[in-house]
């Protein structure tokens, strides 16, 4: 069977279905007796400006020290992609993301940095934190 271009345009794609059905899920921390830090970069975050409707692009940097749960990476990807068509301010989306991550995983400490691409010659970086960071001797 040959699919026509119109059929493809009207069809909900598998990625869209996964994003729509996705939810933040966690798994047990495999090293609960050790303090360690997880860093995740998400360089292709998008949402829409609630005032203009234009797309906003950002790099998200998530760092956290897990408590009893670790957030599953594919779930993070699908969750963050769900903002692609939402009209939401930089400040609101950054705070919503960390609130949702904290609610599902209850980390010891978490920081989210949202580095939005400049628009109109204005560059916005928003940082939000939760909890108290344990001092780790990390060097690479």
Swiss-Prot record:
<keyword id="KW-0560">Oxidoreductase</keyword>
<keyword id="KW-0671">Queuosine biosynthesis</keyword>
<dbReference type="GO" id="GO:0005737">
    <property type="term" value="C:cytoplasm"/>
</dbReference>
<dbReference type="InterPro" id="IPR050084">
    <property type="entry name" value="NADPH_dep_7-cyano-7-deazaG_red"/>
</dbReference>
<dbReference type="InterPro" id="IPR016856">
    <property type="entry name" value="QueF_type1"/>
</dbReference>
<comment type="function">
    <text>Catalyzes the NADPH-dependent reduction of 7-cyano-7-deazaguanine (preQ0) to 7-aminomethyl-7-deazaguanine (preQ1).</text>
</comment>
<dbReference type="InterPro" id="IPR043133">
    <property type="entry name" value="GTP-CH-I_C/QueF"/>
</dbReference>
<comment type="similarity">
    <text>Belongs to the GTP cyclohydrolase I family. QueF type 1 subfamily.</text>
</comment>
<feature type="binding site">
    <location>
        <begin position="71"/>
        <end position="73"/>
    </location>
    <ligand>
        <name>substrate</name>
    </ligand>
</feature>
<feature type="binding site">
    <location>
        <begin position="90"/>
        <end position="91"/>
    </location>
    <ligand>
        <name>substrate</name>
    </ligand>
</feature>
<dbReference type="GO" id="GO:0006400">
    <property type="term" value="P:tRNA modification"/>
</dbReference>
<dbReference type="Pfam" id="PF14489">
    <property type="entry name" value="QueF"/>
</dbReference>
<keyword id="KW-0963">Cytoplasm</keyword>
<feature type="active site" description="Proton donor">
    <location>
        <position position="56"/>
    </location>
</feature>
<dbReference type="GO" id="GO:0008616">
    <property type="term" value="P:queuosine biosynthetic process"/>
</dbReference>
<protein>
    <recommendedName>
        <fullName>NADPH-dependent 7-cyano-7-deazaguanine reductase</fullName>
        <ecNumber>1.7.1.13</ecNumber>
    </recommendedName>
</protein>
<keyword id="KW-0521">NADP</keyword>
<dbReference type="GO" id="GO:0033739">
    <property type="term" value="F:preQ1 synthase activity"/>
</dbReference>
<dbReference type="InterPro" id="IPR029500">
    <property type="entry name" value="QueF"/>
</dbReference>
<feature type="active site" description="Thioimide intermediate">
    <location>
        <position position="49"/>
    </location>
</feature>
<comment type="pathway">
    <text>tRNA modification; tRNA-queuosine biosynthesis.</text>
</comment>
